[in-house]
Amino acid sequence: MDTPTPPHPTGSHTTRTPARPRLRRFVREFSYPHGIHPALLPGVSVEDRRVRYGVDRVILAVVGLLVVGFVVWGVLQPDAVLAVSSAALDWVMVHAGWLFVLLAIGMVVFLLVLAFSRYGEIPLGLDGEKPEYSTASWSAMLFAAGIGIGTIFFGPYEPLTYYLAPRPGAYEAGSEEAVTGALAQAALHWGVNAWAIYAIVGLSVGYVSYRRGRVPLMSSIIAPLFGDSPRSDSVGARLIDGLAIIATLFGTAASLGIGALQIGRGVEIVSGWSAPGNTVALGIIVVLTIGTIVSAVSGVARGIRWLSNINMLLALGLALFFFVVGPTAFLLNIVPGVLMDYVSSAPDALGASMAEGEDMQEFLSSWTIFYWAWWVSWAPFVGVFMAKISKGRTIRQYVLGALFIPAAVIVGAFTIIGGTTIWLQRTRGSVAPDGTAASLPAPAEIFWVVLDQLPGGGLVAPVVIVMLAVFFITTADSASIVNSQLSQRGDPAPRRMITVFWALCMAGIAVVMLLTGGDTALTGLQNLITITALPFTVVLVLMAVALQRELANDPFAIRDRYQRAAVEKATVRGLVEYGDDFAFTVERTPPGSWYAAGEGFDSTAAEITDWYRRTDEDGNPVDYDYVLGEYLDEGDGADGPAGAGPSGR
């Protein structure tokens, strides 16, 4: 009579007979870590690992000195920084611009292929683990991720620029076609391709942390490509994590810089007081950085999160304000055209090349490739956030949500704000007085010019200033925490003073960006972002390769391999031996049988089994029971069955 066994880690039941041969059990226990077959493993969460976190003094010292040295150089010799960065940018655009374009296209294709392949059912967590957030809450958080400083700064400025000065060969400037064409071009830059760059980092971090049990470092994602166990203290690992920190610092500093420019212009308009150059913006960076530091050292994170949630509502309210008091019917009428243009013009826009003449080179350098580089620099920061909120989601759920929910939000925001701006230009000619891009106000001023022409705009302006200030603080605070984690071996609770250090570095870079750009501050932002993002572009490509390799040996994929082989071989054997009259049974096959489900597959190979072998904080082997979900040396570790997973809260 069969007796049931306890549930194995996959959450299903098996049956066994009391007479199971002891030799078979002995072989299994000594062939696999902790006596569990890799196909039966439920996954491993980093929250259930014994990890010794600590400050990586090498990364902190090397990256910190480089950044501080750059800030000092930029403050003392901003013209020299601009000259060097401009020359470097020219080289990057000519010799490596294609890499950014291929990345933006390739990541969309790669993620969609994963989502709709058999790997799409693999969870970013343990087998049977439920998502920490409901679908509605998760969608809302992705929704919120699409709103920020850039939406308000570029929302009116970018579409109007494309309307007056389109991509070479795309459409006639100022025409009917230019209305939807301009908004579609902006949607291309801020839409699915942008979020694919973020999503590859989020997917990789979520998979290696909550499915493979490794710390959430950029280096731990691609470590398997080099054949060794992940080591955060190796030269290669430190180089990768250092590049991630540098990219995040410069990418986020750019957002802080444009935020300060826009707040400064808003303060000047509301107060009637002005100062020469970027003096007000520089002062705002200082004041808001102090606010960020207070947030980091005082432990008021809960209050900041509450304020951030309020800010999301204010941002939605701002979009609703534009929609209601602006040209509502016009906006509704252009939505279908924008969507169709977005889809139909994407191949031409993505295929635009630096080899198509000087005008195209100028457009791509100033816009398309700059944006791909900016999103690369933001990828470590945004990706870590997306991974945290997506624990328990399947790869298919994650990819479809991460690509399309925030993209829909930001495209909608651009259509409303940018569409209103284009409508004002078409009906009143009041934004660019002579109808050319050359007559546009400064980028930081355009939003305020548009707002001033809407009923009630003067009342809304102070609210927008506060909203931008909160976006500044929450962005700087969150990015500093991520950089602090990267420089402390993935510590989920990094030291506050190191977080403060990275916040100061970020502010310093933002100051240098404004100083090097002078009156055209965006020039400094664009140069430095594109240059510093290039090395991390290579890291993103390696991430995709490493992820594909690990998914092929995931417990789910191994089970799927056995299932396919078992069914196919059993069917052939049944037809050969019994014709139409056969049924499937599970039985042990003699060694070397061609019809064995595992024939030709080495389930004891190191690349398949070593990753779930448990160790203590010093890397010494310890015993672990995957059925009970606990360490056996001291009886501590995860509580409850392995399939449930620790909450981590």
What are these regions (language model features)?
Residues 62, 93-99, 103-106, 240-248, ...:
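Membrane-interface loop-to-helix entry segments
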Residues 42-52, 78-94, 118-134, 154-243, ...:
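Inter-helical loop and helix-membrane interface segments of multi-pass membrane transporters/permeases
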Residues 1-42, 561-649:
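Long, low-complexity, intrinsically disordered cytosolic termini of multi-pass membrane proteins
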Residues 2-178, 320, 550-551, 605, ...:
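N-terminal alpha-helical transmembrane segments of multi-pass membrane transport
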Residues 29, 55-64, 225-241, 276-293, ...:
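Loop-to-transmembrane helix boundary motifs in multi-pass membrane proteins
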Residues 44-50, 217-232, 259-282, 315-318, ...:
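Helix-loop-helix connectors at the membrane interface of multi-pass transporters/channels
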Residues 32, 51-61, 66-75, 108-113, ...:
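Helix-loop-helix module between adjacent transmembrane segments
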Residues 73-86, 117-121, 156-157, 252-271, ...:
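Transmembrane helix-loop junctions in multi-pass membrane proteins
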